[in-house]
Each structure stands twice: as C-alpha cells, then as structure tokens.
Amino acid sequence: MGRFIFVSFGLLVVAASLSGTGADCLSGWSSYEGHCYKAFELYKTWEDAESFCMEGVKGGHLVSIESSGEADFVAQLISENMKRLDFFVWIGLRVQGDEKQCNSEWSDGSSVSYENWIESESKTCLGLEQQTKFRKWVNLYCGQRIPFVCEA
C-alpha cells in the first residue's frame, strides 16, 4: 500500500511539473511560450487557411507573430516540419477592405506589436518568404493557395 501511494504521488508531481510546458498541446503540435503551433502542408487561400485553423482546434487561428523570438520559432517549425519548402507560408495578418495600411489586429484579435516587413512591401494578405528563411513578411494575393501555420 505504501509503495502504491509513493508511486501515485510521484506521478502527480510529474503531471504537475509538465503542466503548461507543452504537454497540453495536441499530438503533432509544438509549444512556445504557452501557445501551440503546427505547420500544415495543405494548399489553401488565406481565408480558407484561417477557417481551417479555427475549425481544427479550439481557439485556433493563423499564427500571430508578436516577437523576434516567436518569429525564429515559427521559421524553425516550418523548416523542420515541411517536407517541401514552398516559397511562401500564410500568417494571420491581412488588410481588410480597401485600406492601404496594415490592419491593426491579427486574425486572433491580438494587436500588432511586432513587425518584420520586407522593405517596400505593401500590406494585403501576409506570408513568410522562403528567401528570408521564413523570417520576413511579404504581401501576397489573398487567393493564392499556399501552406500555413496555425496557432492555438
């Protein structure tokens, strides 16, 4: 009986220590600073990719890149998890309507506090470009079908 209590307590300690470390991400997803991420090698328009992320996991959206550390994490995630490295990958930022400037929110509703544009780019639907090792943002035609990264 004493051994059972000791083992049960040990398992409880391990479970508590894993809480919030990525253990609560779905299988196949990666954790970074309390969020879960997955690169999808499916070819979808920006809008279809956003819908896919929202329907696939509770609280899911196209990735919102809010720091250089997160940008590096996402770039590494793409490079390590996609068999075919396409030229572009969707992120969760686009301009609504006829505006000429960046929408002030990501698709998940968070504010744009970090920017990493390729110089001279106008701002419509945004993706990451392979030539920059998926670290810089580039504007793209929103109807283009390319891979994407979801965040939850």
UniProtKB/Swiss-Prot annotation:
Q: In which tissues is it expressed?
A: Expressed by the venom gland.
Lineage top rank: taxon: Eukaryota
Known role: Anticoagulant protein which binds to the gamma-carboxyglutamic acid-domain regions of factors IX (F9) and factor X (F10) in the presence of calcium with a 1 to 1 stoichiometry.
Where does the record place it?
Secreted
Keyword Metal-binding set for record: yes
This chain's protein is named Snaclec coagulation factor IX/factor X-binding protein subunit A
Q: Which residues bind Ca(2+)?
A: 64, 66, 70, 151
- C-type lectin domain residues are 32-151
Oligomer and partners: Heterodimer of subunits A and B; disulfide-linked.
Q: Which organism is it from?
A: Trimeresurus stejnegeri (Chinese green tree viper)
To which protein family does this belong?
A: Belongs to the snaclec family.
- Keyword Calcium among record annotations: yes
SMART domains found in the cross-reference section: CLECT
Note from the entry: Calcium is required for ligand binding.
Q: Which PROSITE patterns match?
A: C_TYPE_LECTIN_1, C_TYPE_LECTIN_2
Q: Which residues form the signal peptide?
A: 1-23
Q: Which GO terms describe its cellular component?
A: extracellular region
Q: Which UniProt keywords apply?
A: Blood coagulation cascade inhibiting toxin, Calcium, Disulfide bond, Hemostasis impairing toxin, Metal-binding, Secreted, Signal, Toxin
This entry's Gene Ontology molecular function terms read: metal ion binding; toxin activity
